[in-house]
Amino acid sequence: MNEKIEVFGARVHNLKNIDITIPRNSLTVFTGLSGSGKSSLAFDTIFAEGQRRYIETFSAYARNFLGNMERPDVDKITGLSPVISIEQKTTNKNPRSTVGTTTEIYDYLRLLYARAGEAFSYMSGEKMVKYTEEKVVDMIMADYRERKIYILAPLVRNRKGHYRELFEQMRRKGYLYIRIDGEIEELTRGMKVDRYKNHNIEVVIDKMKLSDTEDATQRERLSKTIATAMKQGDGLIMILDNETSAAKYFSKRLMDPVTGIAYKDPAPNIFSFNSPEGACPHCKGLGIIDEIDLKKVIPDDALNIYEGAIVPLGKYKNQMIFWQIEALLKKYDCTLKTPVKDIPKECMDEILYGSLEKLKIAKELVHTSSDYFISFDGIIKYLRTIMESDDSAAGKKWADQFIAEVTCPECHGQRLNREALSYKIWDKNIAELANMDISELKDWIDHVEEHMTEKQRVIATEIVKEIRKRINFLLEVGLDYLALNRQSATLSGGESQRIRLATQIGSQLVNVLYILDEPSIGLHQRDNERLIKSLKELRDMGNTVIVVEHDEDMMRAADWIVDIGPKAGRKGGEVVFQGKPADMLKKHTLTAQYLNGERKIEIPTERRKGNGKSIKLIGCTGNNLKGVDVTFPLGELIVVTGVSGSGKSTLINETLQPILSQHFYRSLKRPMPYKKIEGIDNIDKVVNVDQSPIGRTPRSNPATYTGVFSDIRQLFVNLPEAKIRGYKPGRFSFNVRGGRCEACGGNGYKTIEMNFLPDVMVPCEICHGKRYNRETLEVRFKGKSIADVLDMTVNMAVEFFENVPQILPKIKALQDVGLGYIKLGQSSTTLSGGESQRVKLATELSKRDTGKTLFILDEPTTGLHFEDIRILMDVLEKLVDRGNTVLIIEHNLDVIKLADYIIDMGPEGGRNGGRLLAAGLPEVVAKNKESHTAPFLAKILK
């Protein structure tokens, strides 16, 4: 077997025909500037080739369903093992996917409850019992000695209906008596009951008087009767004492001896909220339901209906629905111009929920010979009809703005039906376990066997061992604060990646090549060592681990480092170093200079004092926040710190930002609960600069996103040649007909379908990839066509447009954020998260600001090298120097040490977090005894 993996002649994206060697069974780190080609080498070359080779083993028919598997542009790769990629971008958005289902811990818990759980009645709380037919006969003969009894089979339990067919069916089977709602009656032809009432119905199978001694004949008769009753009653029978009329239930299934309710035999799917057997029938296992929010339907009750108080209807229009409401209002001596707050509640209820009586619409309005009478279903039903209709996606989207998600009133958010929630082990049902933090669950699992019977222990031992193993893997990757019922869609990229990492460690595979994309994202320095230990564990099992990473601890812990550079984009794509970390420290690459201390991000000599104004957020209680009161001083660089799960994102992204977005932009996103906010008028806008893509189609690019492309097109329109030809700005767009190449639709390439082979993209033979037709390309500025301009890097464009004041600032802003290497027309789908974020920052930088803007950034250092961080922080410092406020959620100490003000959350993650531990200057926070950030900060500030 090869002792190394070798890549020869890699040319994907900006890679310059590079060769690299990776030792087998090693922890290898790929590092380098953002845009240098690390991901191109790791994911687009090594992973893509590994996946392609695996899929080539499938039949041509199977390959047809697996989509595009192009061969990467590489000469050859030797020694390649099966490859598993663990990226950040593949978060599961399905609301039914949770931490428990992803890690399979919940599946093992379902098995544990199905095999070792004890059932209790949801009606009486009694422990459920289960008997064999022989045991039932013994109990009846012992309990009812010398008594006259009826043996009945329950048919209907508390349900509505006339049951005519059921009675006829029983009569034909030869039964003579039936018990309806406690009264025994003779079965007659055509018998029925009130269909609108709930009924309890039992058929009388037999009646007998038991002797006071053991009678073999009587026992045989009773046994046959019990067997018949069990069959007729679906495993449940009822014994009625003739003297006292007291009823007692017996069942072959789990049964409540008091009320007679019976459960099916437990199976794992009864405890699954994704199965009809276990899901809460009201919310279908989601734990939440959509309700129409009246505050969104009528946000301002001081307005009247004519002016548009009912938002779904808008202002008055000459339409039937307004005529109906007018007729309703007339009954209560009101008009369309009466303020909503002055309309009687009974009238508003009819407007919202409908009226039973027919409303009279004047014949003049409907142009008929007589008055028109019509019923009115109400605004709520109107909205529900649109919501539940499959006809119009746009209509559904419109109705969504009036919807609020509320906890299901039936299961109280626990997702399961009441039967599933009635099974317990050590006084806990399965939903209570799913609601625990992983660290709490570990404690429960470690002690649960002490509280089991011998039989339960024998059944549970292996299951508990598997659960414990998986919990330990999650703890190792620093996810102790998550609960099993946490939705996968709410996890950050780093969290979902570490969950998949824990799952992979649990799978115990060997001889596999794992490729991870920055697993340290969102991880506090405290948890970094646990993550590195997990990766080494994966390596020691006999696997090769490649990590694309910028974290200093990870680099120093690696067995092998590959440094890609020297710069980014066209100036990157080369191997500037490959070897052991100790050897790298002796080199002079950009990465080595930061590792050996030749270069560093300097700590400021003095910190800003701000402008004296602030925003105060009081009483935040979303997720795990414990009534947090926090002050954000304006005109400063504020950094929010704390371990993973301590409440940073809840405080900023889920509370502060939605409040401000609602205030400034009427955003529909609702903030998490809080009491009040003060000082909102001290800023004039809020800008959230995240790492989501700037566009999801190949037609989107940095030039279109920043708006500079409109200015460039206008420049070309004003050229003499364009004026002579009468060209308008649309002529220079590749998205509309006129100037674009129609052969390829302005894409610059054509997609050739190859049926059983992957689709092939070839440059358009008419425009040769330039996107425009010949006539458009004949218009030139300084000898360059519009296609040539799009093909320029930002650095080239800055020189080219240096004398064009309306274009230069927008391009210069891209250069200032360190994106000089990307092309103006580069497809946004090829940009990394860090690059997308900096394009957004550049767009904001190029705008004129009032110096009263609040910028919010969540972990902006994701995907950034030390040098990229230095450039990014220079840009953010400039924004603050202009009077703006920059608020960053961050774990990176190079950013934290530059803060003017730190807000530290903690002390732990999940339930043990959610408190404000410290706020103030970095030097002050570094002395806090409770904070996990403090010791690391103190070390770097020395």
Ranges and model annotations:
Residues 1-942:
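Conserved phosphate-binding elements of NTP-dependent enzyme cores
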